[in-house]
Amino acid sequence: MSQPTLVALDIETTGLDPQRDAIIEIGAIRFRGDRLEGEYHTLLNPGRSIPRNVVDLTGITDAMVARAPRAIDKLPELEAFVGDDPVVGHNVRFDLSFLRVGKILRYNEAVDTYPIASALLPTATRYNLGALARQLGIVLPATHRALDDTRVTVAVYQTLYQRALALPLKTLAEIVNLQQDVDWGANLLFEEALRARSRELASGRAAPGSISLEPRTLPRGLVPVAEPTPLDDEALAHLLEPGGAFAQRFANYEFRPEQVRMLKAVARAFSEGKHAMIEAGTGTGKSFAYLVPAAQWAVQNGQRVVVSTNTINLQEQLLRKDVPDVEAALKIGLRAALLKGRSNYLCPRRLDNARRHRPKQADEMRVLAKVLTWLATETPAGD
């Protein structure tokens, strides 16, 4: 089934108020899927001086629009170019608010790449058009002009559509189901993505439904030994010494005597069942100094070892970098899990409550779609 014809557009204006400010440039592109079908562009004379900040942003000067037509003469052309097709834009309601003052495009469906991106790129830190283009690998033009921004908008929409197609079918179907009573600017894209995969639904290979948050089946836990075997602190220290396992594994490994002394102190504390309070300065290599004996103790004696950190950033570093390095250097099978404070995790009860009550407003739908996509594609643990 072919995709619908869409018209992406962008305008440049003298300000932000559609009742007081005026349009100075319009750019529009008609497209269907990956195929571009036409472009429309015009400068407009606003009948007033263009503010300095707008000149700096767009490069459009009073001289450039001095002989340009007025909006009243060109808006009918734009209306004919767009027709009844849905209008795509980034924060598109801003553009449409100006155009509807001119009494055109009042009934066209609005498709907004902002909520679409918010849902499909749940971990992005910024959602302005330039930031999205950079994140998606889209080349940005040198100028901030209407037709240039429209081309970027088309590329962003097409890329996000492919992202929607790649969603798990259950997630895609649930988003479409939840958005039925809400116009949030992303309805058309998700409906088209689900329609494009309708054959997969019909074949029975997957069925729509809710994302499961049931606990996963884990392998058998550790079986602790009755009498723990003490650690060989000298053998562990050798791993960190010149020519040891770490030096062989890491090209830029640097031997640090303070690190070895700390490792031995930690190993003795494990072996003797005592507390140890150790102060070590920056550059000591503290992580390996306590992780090496901790890992060896866990594997050797079948006991869990808890490492409590002061920051989440250090937790992430240990789990994603240091623990795998220790496992590789020691050549042991090591399982590690990350446990954060309760406030760092999604509450399944609240999520299910939001699903049952269904979103009533666009912002509610955007956040719920964002969470569902995040659960399906970004996080294995809901944190």
Locations of regions flagged by a protein language model:
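A substrate-engagement module of RecA-like helicase motors
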Residues: 218, 233-244, 303-383
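Conserved pre-motif I regulatory segment
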Residues: 230-278
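Acidic two-metal-ion nuclease catalytic site recognized across multiple nuclease folds
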Residues: 158-238
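Acidic, Mg2+-coordinating catalytic module of metal-dependent nucleases/exonucleases
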Residues: 83-102, 124-194
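Walker A/P-loop
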Residues: 271-293, 305
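Post-Walker A helix-loop "phosphate-sensing" segment adjacent to the P-loop in P-loop NTPases
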Residues: 297-303
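Conserved non-catalytic scaffold segment of RNase H-like nuclease domains
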Residues: 1-109, 115, 122-144
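Alpha-helical scaffold elements adjacent to nucleotide-binding pockets in ATP/GTP-utilizing enzyme cores
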Residues: 53, 57, 98, 128-132, ...
